């Protein structure tokens, strides 16, 4: 993805998930979104090559980590399958992204021929893309969810730095995309982080706040799904007003006040844990992303 890279290692003989690793996308320093990265390739003669080199090196390292966790070796790796937005797939395969930058937003390929440039001698296959801004991650998601086999209309959402939507069923889908911004990936949020170890991924209320953490252990921050969950729970508990204001303790329900403090502007700051909090600015960033 634009913000996060996740690798899952499977034993295909028995279908077992052997290990999972994730990290910030190594290209993040070149731009928070795909438009910034496309621009980088247009402004520098070696831009595309540099971005390709960064992401391929990162995937190689993450695969090494995944294999180590599973006590497996590179010699056992038979195939690498990648699904991502169209720009990310192009950059990994060392292809030009100039055509995606302007009307009619035509990519060099939609990866209908899935074979890509091998990584360390291991064959690489890409999920087929739909268009310049509807990538192989959407195709993979529709297949994995089973929506392609269902009657009637169903809405599939991929909410991240780029937001894609697909509406339809077994007779086909209509797809579109929007630049939703990095908030859904935890970027620009005071305690935000990608969906990697330590990220709060789900929040719920059950006589108190309960949460799930990616990889287990102590929470370090909020990823996109955790941010959405927390905002929904706070709205339900009347800590966030209908218009989106995060209330200070004196305006919030009595049972919620121990999690709140007042900021310098008269709004609330909510503390899920001593290390993980939500500010009024975070709520606003989420509203803008939506």
Q: What are the functions of these language-model segments?
A:
Residues 83-87:
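Core structural elements
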Residues 28-34, 91-92:
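Short acidic/His/Gly/Ser-rich catalytic and metal-binding motifs that mark active-site loops
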Residues 13, 31, 64-68:
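Phosphate-binding active sites in nucleotide-utilizing proteins
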Residues 68-72, 147:
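Secondary-structure boundary motif
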Residues 37-64, 77, 89-158, 164-290:
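Helical "lid/coupling" subdomains associated with nucleotide-phosphate turnover
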Residues 1-27, 153-171:
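Gly/Thr-rich phosphate-binding beta-strand-loop-beta motif of the actin/hexokinase/Hsp70
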Residues 72-78:
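Membrane-interfacial loop-to-helix junctions in multi-pass inner-membrane proteins
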């Amino acid at each position: 993805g634009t913000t996060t890279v996740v690798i899952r290692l499977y034993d295909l003989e028995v279908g077992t998930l052997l290990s999972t690793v994730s990290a910030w996308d190594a290209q993040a320093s070149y731009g928070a979104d795909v438009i910034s990265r496309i621009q980088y390739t247009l402004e520098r003669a070696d831009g595309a090559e540099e971005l390709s080199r960064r992401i391929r090196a990162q995937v190689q390292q993450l695969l090494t980590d995944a294999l180590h966790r599973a006590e497996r070796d590179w010699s056992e790796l038979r195939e690498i399958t990648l699904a991502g937005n169209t720009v990310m797939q192009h950059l990994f395969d060392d292809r030009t992204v100039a055509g995606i930058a302007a009307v009619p937003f035509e990519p060099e390929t939609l990866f209908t021929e899935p074979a890509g440039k091998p990584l360390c001698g291991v064959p690489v296959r890409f999920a087929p893309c739909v268009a310049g801004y509807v990538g192989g991650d959407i195709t993979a998601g529709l297949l994995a969810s089973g929506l392609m086999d269902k009657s009637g209309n169903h809405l599939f959402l991929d909410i991240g730095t780029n937001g894609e939507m697909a509406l339809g069923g077994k007779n086909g889908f209509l797809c579109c995309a929007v630049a939703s911004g990095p908030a859904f990936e935890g970027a620009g949020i005071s305690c935000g982080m990608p969906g990697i170890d330590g990220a709060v991924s789900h929040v719920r209320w059950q006589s108190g706040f309960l949460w799930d953490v990616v990889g287990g252990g102590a929470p370090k921050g909020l990823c996109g799904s955790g941010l959405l969950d927390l905002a929904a729970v706070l709205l339900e508990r009347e800590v966030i007003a209908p218009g989106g204001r995060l209330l200070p303790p004196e305006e919030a329900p009595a049972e919620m006040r121990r999690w709140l403090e007042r900021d310098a502007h008269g709004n609330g700051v909510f503390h899920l844990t001593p290390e993980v909090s939500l500010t009024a600015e975070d709520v606003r960033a989420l509203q803008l992303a939506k």
